[in-house]
């Protein structure tokens, strides 16, 4: 019983010691953890287009991009998104570069006399709505071949003339000009004699406008965005994602986005890459803005044409200035128009049904009360009309007939095509301003586009009706194209508390690990537990570094090939900036690890205690990304503590290195050591001199306290006289006057010699006193601590005895177990050996038994 209690006490003591030792947690640095954070840096583009803009602005695309699935849940937002914002800005720059208005001039703000006739002002003749259902036109309709479909008439134009000076000195010149009526604003009064009206250009309120300096085509271009090394692009692959919420549970990682088209249009999105066999809606998180992706099953498309032929002649205004306008020669241009192919009716019904089932939608569920609606009149033409670009020309289409046809409104004109006109002065879609472009080029203009999305605002009205109002926000197109992406910065450095403390391990040969090709390979462990991911940090960190180096090399190669073309462009600067950003990130990570003393280590234990003991990771169930989100607010403090600890360790190592120099005898004779010795000697001499002065002053003060005494007097008790007798043979006549009053033949040594002996005695007395004081102080300290030390020895003696007894008991138990095992093994071996002997004798006896059996058979 007593022995069991002792064993229990030993176990409790060992457990207590382990708990005391293991309670302290230290910061451990892990390199290569699969974690990230949101980033906002310039991306670079890659394209296969070999036109001028694609060659100058982007790098060649090689289609070598893979997506790696991640078992994580991540938040995405199509509106608060770095990639979409950069795409909007870059496409705007592309738009300005391709259809470049590059000359700024003062608007033509002179009074013009214009002749507005009835025939000139006719754009769409007023027609009486027919109750009979009109068949939609198709590819085989005769009016398509003849450009003479019902309702399409000539453009609305105005003929004007005005006077200006400046071309010749002190002379006026009259100019004749033809304008689209939408570009001028006229007074209500008309001169009855000439039938002319005073008109002005409608942009005269703008102080400065920009005119196109050359005619360009706006051809479709496909390009993708790529992240620089050290960064990644995450994509939401969840069909429930609606642009804002809920969080995406199916995430994949890549280095580049999908290919996307350069789109610039209102109302509809054309040639998008997000079309699927379903209709889905991206809804803004705070207002009613939406972007609706149409089902590609319905094959929706739009075909636009500007028939006719004309000649454009510029006019010269003053010296050296030219203003391009539209004088028409021989024939006025026919009106442009667009017709819509595909099953639009069913596609729009599916849009309504999808809206009614959307979780953000709170309006009526009856799709008959959900209608498509054009924006209110009175706003910019780009809002009122559907604005698109066809081969560099800007089409403004009146969609009234089309909406009547889609909604099947009774007593209205319903057609699957829309009349359009081309404008020379347009409002910019990304920045506030106006651009003046060249007149349309000669010849017929045609373009064919696939309709993939609708830009709309959802207007709910008292839960009874809902209007899907078409919008002119061109930027929404790129929120649909790239809204399922987000840019993240890989943060391979992680912190976590462990019970391990830093030590200095022996440098051994590093073990080889399996090399995994690719930068994003280590992100495959993003969805596994922290403990499992930590076991593969060596391979992950090598994958990370190798991938960064590989990406850097690939980016450097393509930049070198394109450097002559990229030199003077804005996007070329962005690409170089992306590469510099990647290098800065890599060097920053390595410098940070080095400042913590963790360079070239995958798991680095430190001496910094973990500050928040209540915050500990769940190594079996928590991912590194979840853990990093919890401790991200501690990173600054942890980093500062690690730097301070590393500085202190370097200081300690320096001091230790200085002490190590004393164990080598030859270092004692080093020149720097001798200089130190001389310094120490000078300090000692100066100290002795100061001490002597202090002692002398103290002695003088002590003697002055006893009464006045001449400084150089010598009392019998102070200086012992040494008598010296004079030579008796010296004549008495040699005595001088100075000998009078003396003691006859006695003389004494000077007092300075005795004073030196006095100082020596005083110094010895002082040192003896200091020694006695120190000895008494140490004796008293030892006497004070002796009871405490005695109690500590008395307390430790049984504990040590218990530990010794426990160790002896464990040793005896091991010996008994070994002895029992040895005896058991010996017995088993004897039994096996006996069995083998019996089997052997039986085998050897087989011939004898056969012979005996044969003998018995013969008898």
Swiss-Prot record:
Q: Cite any additional comment in the entry.
A: Some HIV-2 isolates have been described that can infect cells independently of CD4, using CXCR4 as primary receptor. These isolates may have an exposed coreceptor binding site.
User: One biological-process term from Gene Ontology?
Assistant: clathrin-dependent endocytosis of virus by host cell
Which classification does the entry list for the species?
A: Viruses, Riboviria, Pararnavirae, Artverviricota, Revtraviricetes
**Gene encoding this polypeptide?**
env
Q: Where is the signal peptide?
A: 1-24
What this chain does, per the entry, is described as: The surface protein gp120 (SU) attaches the virus to the host lymphoid cell by binding to the primary receptor CD4. This interaction induces a structural rearrangement creating a high affinity binding site for a chemokine coreceptor like CXCR4 and/or CCR5. This peculiar 2 stage receptor-interaction strategy allows gp120 to maintain the highly conserved coreceptor-binding site in a cryptic conformation, protected from neutralizing antibodies. Since CD4 also displays a binding site for the disulfide-isomerase P4HB/PDI, a P4HB/PDI-CD4-CXCR4-gp120 complex may form. The surface protein gp120 is a ligand for CD209/DC-SIGN and CLEC4M/DC-SIGNR, which are respectively found on dendritic cells (DCs), and on endothelial cells of liver sinusoids and lymph node sinuses. These interactions allow capture of viral particles at mucosal surfaces by these cells and subsequent transmission to permissive cells. DCs are professional antigen presenting cells, critical for host immunity by inducing specific immune responses against a broad variety of pathogens.
Stretches for region V5: 463-470
Sorted UniProt keywords: AIDS, Apoptosis, Clathrin-mediated endocytosis of virus by host, Cleavage on pair of basic residues, Coiled coil, Disulfide bond, Fusion of virus membrane with host endosomal membrane, Fusion of virus membrane with host membrane, Glycoprotein, Host cell membrane, Host endosome, Host membrane, Host-virus interaction, Inhibition of host innate immune response by virus, Inhibition of host tetherin by virus, Lipoprotein, Membrane, Palmitate, Signal, Transmembrane, Transmembrane helix, Viral attachment to host cell, Viral envelope protein, Viral immunoevasion, Viral penetration into host cytoplasm, Virion, Virus endocytosis by host, Virus entry into host cell
Residues annotated as transmembrane: 681-701
Q: Which residues lie on this side of the membrane: Extracellular?
A: 25-680
Q: Region MPER: what ranges? A: 658-679
GO cellular component terms listed in the entry, alphabetical order: host cell endosome membrane; host cell plasma membrane; membrane; viral envelope; virion membrane
User: What SUPFAM superfamilies does the annotation carry?
Assistant: gp120 core (SSF56502), Virus ectodomain (SSF58069)
Ranges where the record places region V3:
304-337
Region described as Disordered: spans on this chain:
726-745
Q: Positions of the region Fusion peptide?
A: 513-533
Q: Please list the residues annotated as glycosylated.
A: 38, 71, 115, 148, 163, 176, 188, 195, 205, 237, 247, 271, 277, 288, 299, 309, 343, 366, 398, 411, 448, 463, 467, 612, 621, 637
Record-given protein name = Envelope glycoprotein gp160
Q: Does the keyword Ion transport apply?
A: no
UniProt note: domains: Some of the most genetically diverse regions of the viral genome are present in Env. They are called variable regions 1 through 5 (V1 through V5). Coreceptor usage of gp120 is determined mainly by the primary structure of the third variable region (V3) in the outer domain of gp120. Binding to CCR5 involves a region adjacent in addition to V3. The 17 amino acids long immunosuppressive region is present in many retroviral envelope proteins. Synthetic peptides derived from this relatively conserved sequence inhibit immune function in vitro and in vivo.
Motif YXXV motif: which ranges? 708-711
What are the start and end residues of every segment in region (Immunosuppression)? 576-592
Changes after translation: Specific enzymatic cleavages in vivo yield mature proteins. Envelope glycoproteins are synthesized as an inactive precursor that is heavily N-glycosylated and processed likely by host cell furin in the Golgi to yield the mature SU and TM proteins. The cleavage site between SU and TM requires the minimal sequence [KR]-X-[KR]-R.
């Amino acid at each position: 019983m007593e022995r069991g209690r002792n064993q229990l006490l030993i176990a409790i003591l060992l457990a207590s010691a382990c708990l005391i030792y293991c309670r302290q947690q230290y910061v451990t640095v892990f390199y290569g953890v699969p974690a990230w954070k949101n980033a906002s840096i310039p991306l670079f583009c890659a394209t296969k287009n070999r036109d001028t803009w694609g060659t100058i602005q982007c790098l060649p695309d090689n289609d070598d991009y893979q997506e790696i699935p991640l078992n994580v849940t991540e938040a995405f937002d199509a509106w608060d998104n770095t990639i979409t914002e950069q795409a909007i800005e870059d496409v705007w720059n592309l738009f300005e570069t391709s259809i470049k208005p590059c000359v700024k001039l003062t608007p033509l703000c002179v009074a013009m006399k214009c002749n507005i006739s009835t025939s000139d002002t006719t754009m769409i003749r007023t027609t009486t709505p027919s109750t009979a259902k009109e068949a939609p036109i198709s590819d085989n309709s005769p009016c398509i071949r003849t450009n003479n479909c019902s309702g399409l008439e000539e453009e609305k134009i105005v003929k004007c003339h005005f006077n200006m000076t400046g071309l010749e000195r002190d002379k006026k010149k009259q100019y004749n000009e033809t304008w689209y009526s939408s570009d001028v604003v006229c007074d209500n009064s008309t001169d009855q004699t000439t039938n002319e009206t005073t008109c002005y250009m409608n942009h005269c309120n703008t102080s400065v406008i920009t005119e196109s300096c050359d005619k360009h085509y706006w051809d479709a271009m496909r390009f993708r965005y790529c992240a620089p090394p050290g960064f990644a692009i995450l994509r939401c692959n969840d069909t429930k994602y609606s642009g804002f919420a809920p969080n995406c549970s199916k995430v994949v990682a890549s280095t580049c986005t999908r290919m996307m088209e350069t789109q610039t249009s209102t109302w509809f999105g054309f040639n998008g890459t997000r079309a699927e066999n379903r209709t889905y809606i991206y809804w803004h998180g705070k207002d009613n803005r939406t972007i609706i992706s149409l089902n590609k099953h319905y094959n929706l498309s739009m075909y636009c044409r500007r028939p006719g032929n004309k000649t454009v002649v510029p006019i010269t205004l003053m010296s050296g200035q030219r203003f391009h306008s539209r004088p028409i020669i021989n024939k006025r241009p026919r009106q442009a128009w667009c017709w819509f192919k595909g099953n639009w009716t069913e596609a729009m019904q599916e849009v309504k049904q999808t809206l009614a089932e959307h979780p953000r939608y709170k309006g009526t569920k009856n799709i008959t009360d959900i209608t498509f609606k054009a924006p209110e009149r009175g706003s910019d033409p780009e809002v009122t009309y559907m604005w698109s670009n066809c081969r560099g020309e800007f089409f403004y289409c009146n969609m009234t007939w089309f909406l009547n046809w889609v909604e099947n409104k009774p007593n209205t004109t319903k057609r699957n095509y829309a009349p359009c006109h081309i404008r020379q002065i347009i409002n910019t879609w990304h920045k506030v301003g106006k651009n003046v472009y060249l007149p349309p080029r000669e010849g017929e203009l045609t373009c064919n586009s696939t309709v993939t999305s609708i830009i709309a605002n959802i207007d709910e009205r008292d839960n009874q009706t809902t209007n899907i109002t078409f919008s002119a926000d061109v930027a929404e197109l790129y929120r649909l194209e790239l809204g399922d992406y987000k840019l993240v910065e890989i943060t391979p450095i992680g912190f976590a508390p462990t019970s391990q403390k830093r030590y200095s391990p022996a440098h051994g040969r590093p073990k080889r690990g399996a090399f995994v090709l690719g930068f994003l390979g280590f992100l495959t462990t993003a969805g596994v537990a922290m403990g499992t991911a930590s076991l593969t940090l060596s391979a992950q960190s090598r994958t990370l570094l190798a991938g960064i180096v590989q990406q850097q090399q690939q980016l450097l190669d393509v930049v070198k090939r394109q450097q002559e073309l990229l030199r003077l462009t804005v996007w070329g600067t962005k690409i170089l900036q992306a590469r510099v950003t990647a290098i800065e990130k890599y060097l920053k990570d390595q410098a940070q690890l080095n400042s913590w003393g963790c360079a070239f280590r995958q798991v680095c234990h430190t001496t910094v205690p973990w500050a928040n003991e209540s915050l500990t990771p769940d190594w079996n169930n928590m991912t590194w990304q979840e853990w990093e989100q919890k401790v991200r607010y501690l990173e600054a403090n942890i980093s500062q503590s690690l730097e301070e600890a590393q500085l202190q360790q370097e200081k300690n190592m320096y001091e230790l290195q200085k002490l190590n120099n004393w164990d080598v005898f030859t270092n004692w004779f080093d020149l720097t050591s001798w200089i130190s010795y001389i310094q120490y000697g000078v300090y000692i001499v100066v100290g002795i001199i100061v001490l002597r002065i202090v002692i002398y002053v103290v002695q003088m003060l002590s003697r002055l306290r006893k009464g006045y005494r001449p400084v150089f007097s010598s009392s019998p008790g102070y200086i012992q006289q040494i008598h010296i007798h004079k030579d008796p043979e010296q004549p008495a006549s040699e005595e001088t006057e100075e000998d009078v009053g003396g003691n006859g033949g006695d003389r004494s040594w000077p007092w300075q010699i005795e004073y030196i002996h006095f100082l020596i005695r005083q110094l010895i007395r002082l040192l003896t006193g200091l020694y006695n004081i120190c000895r008494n102080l140490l004796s008293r300290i030892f006497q004070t601590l002796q009871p405490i030390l005695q109690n500590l020895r008395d307390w430790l003696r049984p504990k040590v005895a218990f530990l010794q007894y426990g160790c002896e008991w464990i040793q005896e138990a091991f010996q008994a177990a070994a002895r029992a095992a040895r005896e058991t093994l010996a017995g088993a071996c004897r039994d096996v050996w006996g069995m083998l002997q019996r089997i052997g004798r039986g085998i050897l006896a087989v011939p004898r038994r056969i012979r005996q059996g044969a003998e018995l058979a013969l008898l």
